[in-house]
């Protein structure tokens, strides 16, 4: 249903007043604090109509209203005025990264801190799966008997260690030859491509060093990442939720429980983040577990390739006009840094 300009102006003012003050909003407040150009009586009439349409609801008998999920949805989609980050805020973000070592995990830790601190909400950053990163170098090292340590150095700066066990002894010289052969042929490809296509093709050609076809299947299997691992999930700002939901104990308990379900968060941030742009999930339009919560998400890239995602999690009365540009600016900065790390 299309809203008239006056309905849109009143809904916009009501959402912003409620975000600012966290109290039900009445016609008198809107008339006095916002330049809507309407009398209190007309505003009261419009508020009643907005309530009938499901955009706002009366929380108490006092007459004040608060936005519904539908009201927030319309506000975010078409009414919000985005504020540009101040120069000081941009400097603060950049300074946080300068304090970190330029490794992927350190960049993602800094990202979670920045988002939580400046949004005054919780933050989640999902690092790349090993299969989405590209290989820079592989090293096979003999440990003991049939045990081999495989070290995968990825373009992003991530270093993965995998133990491989064989039923027979393998010399370090053989492992050196296989390492060199793999580096010559699979460097620059992602792990999934190496596992599913390149190593099988190399085995069929039978051109590798002695023993390669015998060892290759185990090497390919060991390259795989555990899809249930949550080691690449970075969370910060949970303390902000205590302030955000201090008057809503049941809601606070539900959202803190959500952060205990790290596998759910990982899957959610893998599935709900768009290929481009910033996406806002309001309440149960994302999942039944998210009632009363807003999640703002986006992805970050290495070059042109999307390798991970990030998000801000907080109450629906979030300061959208600051949170949306914050996550957009941060994702672009992170993408630039990770792309440089990969070169």
Curated annotation (Swiss-Prot):
Record InterPro entries: GAF-like_dom_sf, HrcA, HrcA_C, WH-like_DNA-bd_sf, WH_DNA-bd_sf, WHTH_transcript_rep_HrcA_IDD
Q: Which biological process terms from the Gene Ontology are attached to this UniProt entry? A: negative regulation of DNA-templated transcription
Keywords, A to Z, come to: Repressor, Stress response, Transcription, Transcription regulation
MF terms (GO), sorted A to Z: DNA binding
Establish whether keyword Repressor is in the entry. yes
Q: Which Pfam families match?
A: HrcA
The record's function comment reads: Negative regulator of class I heat shock genes (grpE-dnaK-dnaJ and groELS operons). Prevents heat-shock induction of these operons.
Q: Which NCBIfam families match?
A: hrcA (TIGR00331)
Family per similarity comment: Belongs to the HrcA family.
The protein's name in its UniProt record: Heat-inducible transcription repressor HrcA
> What organism is the protein native to?
Leptospira biflexa serovar Patoc (strain Patoc 1 / Ames)
């Amino acid at each position: 249903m299309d809203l008239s300009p006056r309905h849109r102006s009143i809904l916009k003012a009501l959402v912003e007043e409620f975000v600012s003050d966290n109290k039900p909003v009445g016609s008198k407040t809107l008339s006095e604090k916002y330049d809507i150009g309407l009398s209190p009586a007309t505003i009261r009439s419009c508020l009643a109509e907005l309530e009938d349409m499901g955009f706002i609801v009366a929380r108490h008998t006092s007459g004040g209203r608060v936005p519904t999920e539908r009201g927030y949805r319309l506000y975010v989609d078409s009414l919000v005025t985005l504020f540009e980050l101040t120069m000081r805020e941009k400097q603060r973000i950049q300074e946080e990264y300068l304090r970190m070592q330029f490794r992927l995990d350190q960049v993602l830790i800094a990202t979670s801190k920045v988002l939580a601190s400046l949004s005054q909400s919780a933050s989640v950053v999902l690092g790349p799966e090993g299969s989405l990163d590209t290989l820079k170098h592989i090293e096979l090292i003999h440990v003991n008997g049939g045990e081999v340590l495989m070290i995968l150095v990825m373009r992003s700066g991530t270093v993965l260690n995998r133990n491989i066990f064989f039923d027979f002894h393998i010399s370090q010289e053989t492992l050196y030859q296989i390492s060199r052969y793999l580096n010559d042929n699979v460097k620059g490809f992602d792990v999934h491509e190496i596992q599913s296509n390149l190593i099988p093709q190399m085995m069929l050609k039978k051109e590798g060093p002695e023993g390669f076809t015998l060892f290759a299947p185990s090497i390919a299997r060991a390259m795989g990442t555990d899809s249930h691992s949550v080691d690449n999930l970075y969370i910060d700002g949970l303390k902000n939720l205590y302030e955000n939901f201090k008057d809503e104990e049941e809601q606070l308990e539900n959202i803190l429980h959500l952060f205990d379900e790290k596998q759910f968060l990982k899957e959610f941030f893998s599935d709900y983040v768009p290929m481009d742009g910033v996406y806002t999930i309001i309440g149960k339009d994302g999942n039944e577990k998210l009632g009363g919560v807003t999640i703002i998400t986006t992805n970050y890239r290495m070059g042109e390739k999307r390798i991970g995602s990030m998000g801000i999690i907080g109450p629906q009365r979030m300061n959208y006009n600051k949170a949306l540009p914050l996550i957009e600016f941060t994702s672009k900065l992170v993408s630039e840094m990770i792309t440089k790390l990969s070169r």
